Structure formats: C-alpha cells, structure tokens
Amino acid sequence: TYSVGGLILSNSGAITANYWLSEIYDQEIADAHKSGAIHLHDLSMLTGYCAGWSLKQLIQQGLGIPGKINSTPASHLSTLCNQMVNFLGIMQNEWAGAQAFSSFDTYLAPFVKVDNLSQKEVKQCIQSFVFGVNTPSRWGTQAPFSNITLDWTVPRDLENLPAIVGGKEQDFTYGDCKKEMDMVNKAFIEIMTEGDADGRGFQYPI
C-alpha cells in the first residue's frame, strides 16, 4: 500500500544501505553482499537489531521520554496496555527488529486481581493492546515488530515476590495470581484466534 511515510523509509533506507556498504564494511564484504554470496540484514537502518525489555521496569516507573512527556506507573490494566503499546512504538523508532516483553501474563495478572476485572473487561484491555501493536504507527507506516512470552504458570523466581501495581508492592505475590494469569491468556488466545474486524489474523505480537 502506498504511503508518503513508506516512500520516505524506502528512499532513506537505500541511502543508509549504500553508506554501510561504502563507508563501514570493507570492499570484499560489500561486494559479497552485492553479488548475493552473503546477506547483510537490515542495512537500511543504522541501529541495533532486536531487544528485550522488562515489563517490571515499566510497571514500577511508568513511561517517560526525557524532555517530552512523563507518565506515572499504571494503576489499571487498561492504562498499562496503553503504555505498553506506546513503549513498543517508541523503541521501534530506535531499533531495526523486534522488541520483546517477557512474562506478559505474569506481570499483567495483578492488575486484573486488584480491580477484580471480569473476563470481558480483561479481553477488552488485551484487545486494545493487540490492535495497538498492529497499527502502522512506526516510521515508514509499519506496525511495531513486537514479541511477547507467556509463562502459563508463575515462574519460580517471581512466585514469592510481592506483586506490583501502580508502582507499589501489593499485599499479595505473583504466585497468588494464577487465576488472573489464566484470564489474561484466555483473552489473548481468543483475540488472536478471532482476528480483526474482517477476520484477518494479527501479525503481532509474535
């Protein structure tokens, strides 16, 4: 699909790739890439490839950009889902490849517990996250390339730690949130299975 943002990305990417091949790599490597003997991935971007991030840090500190805008730690699941989408979008502007969150279900579960959310409410929150990371908001009108991991059961290194909501420790642990983890996972699977309004499958998160 044509877009001005996509055209800008294509043109700037070609210029950046030529810079890599003429100024960074030696002639032998550049020639090998041009001939197809080897492939240098994402030459169109002068940056690192993929990165993984701790949801715990976002939950404890909130989302802020120096000199731009600062958000306090999320106190509700809907707010956290919005912050996650924004975080992934921001990080994708600085990296070429995927941005990942680990223990997605474990860290979201306490927010479900604190607000005593229903399955329908959980699904609405997760739905906003999934649609958010599939919106072509990244530079070049691309959706943020995002990965998450689901624990299914609370990891041993987290099960006895106080759960964090709103940047504060709660009077229960992550291990006390297995029921809420199941709710998050159920909602996620249903949303990914159902697809968008036209029934198309979602590309992200992987």
Which stretches of residues belong to each language-model region?
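Conserved catalytic cores of very large enzyme subunits
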Residues: T1-I206
